[in-house]
């Protein structure tokens, strides 16, 4: 990356890679997007590249889960909850899908800045 600043999609909470100490902030941000239990594993805390890889896998799994829920919502929820609740559920899943897509991009950008796995 150049001195022009971070690329579009870079997380606001993480300073650009040119900034001193950016990796420390990146590690905290990545941990925030992983299961809390990951904090207890020394390799995850000591190896930012491992953490970034795990965060990518985690976000991808969340995205797949949201897609799976979206595909099943009408069938599974419709008969008992009705069309209004199903529509609200689908809207929530659409919003979550958009959030996760943006998060996936941000995690990938941080991972690329940290270096190859």
In which residue ranges do the predicted regions lie?
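Extracellular/periplasmic low-complexity linear segments
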Residues: 6, 10-14
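Eukaryotic low-complexity, intrinsically disordered regulatory segments enriched in serine, proline
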Residues: 17-117
């Amino acid at each position: 990356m150049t001195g022009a600043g971070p690329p579009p999609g870079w997380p606001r909470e993480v300073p650009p890679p040119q900034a001193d100490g950016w990796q420390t902030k990146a590690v905290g941000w990545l941990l925030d997007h992983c299961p809390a239990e990951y904090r207890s594993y020394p390799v995850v805390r000591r190896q930012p590249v491992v953490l970034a890889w795990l965060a990518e896998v985690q976000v991808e799994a969340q995205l797949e889960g949201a897609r799976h829920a979206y595909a099943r919502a009408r069938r599974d929820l419709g008969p008992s909850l009705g069309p209004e609740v199903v529509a609200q559920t689908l809207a929530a899943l659409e919003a979550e899908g958009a959030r996760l897509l943006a998060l996936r991009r941000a995690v990938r950008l941080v991972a690329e800045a940290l270096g190859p796995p």
